[in-house]
Amino acid sequence: MPRMALGLAYDGSSWQGWQTQPHRQTVQDTLEAALARFAGIDGSLPTVCAGRTDTGVHAAMQVVHLDTRLERRAESWVRGVNAFLPPSIAVQWAQPVPDDFHARFSARSRTYLYLLWRGRVRPPLWAGRAGWCFQPLDVQAMRQAASALLGEHDFSSFRSSQCQARHPVRTLHRLDIDERGPFLVFTLRANAFLHHMVRNLMGALLQIGQGRQPVAWMPAVLAARDRRLAAPTFAADGLYLSAIEYPPEYKLNDTDGSGQLLSPFTFA
């Protein structure tokens, strides 16, 4: 059966995560219902995503695949499915892909951004869309601590107790911290992420930025492989799934020919 890939963006503020759940409003359920209406069938069209996002987490570039015999032009998929979606979810592009393409398992890497507002007063115009820290932060100390996380490590200290991953080893390729006016933009790219890994890393970095822990605390916590020794999980508000990287042979809708699917909505 022919396979389609779709690129999505969504505001996660009003959704209880990506994954379908009984009696809950999720992005997956809403998308699959819209796909079924577009295809003119009862029920839903099952999808597989590149990365499941939690309650309150946003996506500037989520990728899904689905199998369907429906033949439409790419632009018809975009406009047609969006006609049945709420304003907080939108298909950005659609493209036929080979049968061996898998939105999750074909991905080489995922990139997340965390948008943090620095200010004495919470930012009402960014409510639900940016994290907030009212205390002064030592950005250089956070950058030094972040460097200890790069490479392949056992990230058990930064995984949720509900994490279902078969093993905790991940390769973190990038962890940048950029100052953009009142914002700090954290960019993290890895082959894959554990459940709550980004938010747990954020919590630890802020402990160091606020001077509550020294820079040397980060590699010690990483080496301990014990979630109890790390910082609390930080808020979901400012977290965005922002890019997915696939092998170039799939010729997806990337912006630079590298296979890295980027979004016009992010700060990257």
Swiss-Prot record:
EC number: 5.4.99.12
Enzyme class: isomerase
Reaction catalyzed: uridine(38/39/40) in tRNA = pseudouridine(38/39/40) in tRNA
Keywords: Isomerase, tRNA processing
GO MF annotations, alphabetized: RNA binding; tRNA pseudouridine(38-40) synthase activity
Biological process per Gene Ontology, one example term: tRNA pseudouridine synthesis
Pfam families, per the entry: PseudoU_synth_1 (PF01416)
Matches recorded under CDD domains: PseudoU_synth_EcTruA
Taxonomy, superkingdom: Bacteria
Binding site for substrate: Y112
Record-annotated active site: D54
Gene3D superfamilies reported for this sequence: Pseudouridine synthase I, catalytic domain, C-terminal subdomain, Pseudouridine synthase I, catalytic domain, N-terminal subdomain
Subunit and interaction comment: Homodimer.
NCBIfam families on file: hisT_truA (TIGR00071)
Family that this chain belongs to: Belongs to the tRNA pseudouridine synthase TruA family.
Function: Formation of pseudouridine at positions 38, 39 and 40 in the anticodon stem and loop of transfer RNAs.
Protein's UniProt name: tRNA pseudouridine synthase A
